[in-house]
């Protein structure tokens, strides 16, 4: 056999030319066990906490436990097909989510993937889900108002941009309604809204999206939904996904609002994960770091300093109480983290006082400095008067012989309660709130309240028609209040004149 050196060298040259240096190295482990969306994996010694893993069929997992001989991971998505012995790959990436204007108007799941049937989100930017909250130097104190459009909140428990205000109450007391009203009220205010639904029924989330669409609010809102049927890891992660999306607007010098509905269900999902990962249980079987779960989330809401762009992220976390018990574990945790709370009471709700805010224990620790001057001027004594009324009303049930001063306080309190009632999905601009509260709290030329002679059941109609009357006859008054944000003597005299004029008109209509 003839050996042809040139042919051999040609073959070798071709082989060398086709040789690639690229070697695919992947650290692979094996599933030891899988139960309820939590897998134990052997062989991933280099895995990092919070790292994403790749299971068969493209399913993702998140590393939560690092143990001596195995790794505990939460499976993101369907886990029924994952079996013992399945291979698992490290990705080397920490969980990230798409951010940007492209997400506005969309409904996404707990990992930021669209679930509204409108195709992919072509976002230009991504961000890590777990990042550190801004430090003290990067922050500025809360000083700009974030109007909710609800008289009871804007007057008594005002919220500022960058604040964390907890909404808590029993189920079916109007917690979500308060949050949705806040979104609707900020149409045209350059506030980008994020609604995170955790553990809700799909029908409930669909209804919220429909309401937002009807009022044209989806244009500036993103809905992040981890429904009741989704695995616990998705419910645990959804609030972090939402806050990461909202932070993009805060960090680009804009203003954002995030609503967590609700964090009780996130805590339950985290408890489920922790127990499956065999972490030691504490009070009410929650793990020891359940406080940190919420604190690291809510600390990411902030008002940034001018040097950092002056953006803000306001958070409205919602907590569901059991039988009005605000001293339970999760409610007390979140109360201590936030800058105030709005407590909704089922008794008030069933009495027809809606929004059913208990003024006595609802408080805003930093919002007072963000309230506009006009509102401070008219609503200064409102909280005290309502508290006195509640106290006297409790005693008045037992005695019929009341002195004149007590009767006067009760009559005034009844009218103030009526004033603060407001229909669902009908938020009101702050200047109109100021006009209504001025009419309810100020006195006329005879030293009596402007609405003292109005029957209690007519107060709601009086307030509605007063605003309509001013819009028609004195449109400049509301406009001036909106511009000046304060009541000077000129505006007060204009309001008094308008109220005198309206008193005659309203009485005629009432008698007719």
From Swiss-Prot:
Its EC number is 7.1.2.2. It is found in: Cell inner membrane. One of its GO terms (molecular function) is ATP binding. Its main location: membrane. Pfam families: ATP-synt_ab, ATP-synt_ab_C, ATP-synt_ab_N. CDD domains: ATP-synt_F1_alpha_C, ATP-synt_F1_alpha_N, F1-ATPase_alpha_CD. GO terms for cellular component: plasma membrane; proton-transporting ATP synthase complex. It is a peripheral membrane protein. Keywords: ATP synthesis, ATP-binding, Cell inner membrane, Cell membrane, CF(1), Hydrogen ion transport, Ion transport, Membrane, Nucleotide-binding, Translocase, Transport. SUPFAM superfamilies: C-terminal domain of alpha and beta subunits of F1 ATP synthase, N-terminal domain of alpha and beta subunits of F1 ATP synthase, P-loop containing nucleoside triphosphate hydrolases. The record marks 362 as: Required for activity. InterPro entries: ATP_synth_asu-like_sf (IPR023366), ATP_synth_asu_C (IPR000793), ATP_synth_asu_C_sf (IPR038376), ATP_synth_F1_a_nt-bd_dom (IPR033732), ATP_synth_F1_asu (IPR005294), ATPase_a/bsu_AS (IPR020003), ATPase_F1/V1/A1_a/bsu_N (IPR004100), ATPase_F1/V1/A1_a/bsu_N_sf (IPR036121). ATP binds at residues 169-176. It is an enzyme of class 7 (translocase). It catalyses: ATP + H2O + 4 H(+)(in) = ADP + phosphate + 5 H(+)(out). Belongs to the ATPase alpha/beta chains family. Produces ATP from ADP in the presence of a proton gradient across the membrane. The alpha chain is a regulatory subunit. F-type ATPases have 2 components, CF(1) - the catalytic core - and CF(0) - the membrane proton channel. CF(1) has five subunits: alpha(3), beta(3), gamma(1), delta(1), epsilon(1). CF(0) has three main subunits: a(1), b(2) and c(9-12). The alpha and beta chains form an alternating ring which encloses part of the gamma chain. CF(1) is attached to CF(0) by a central stalk formed by the gamma and epsilon chains, while a peripheral stalk is formed by the delta and b chains. This is ATP synthase subunit alpha.
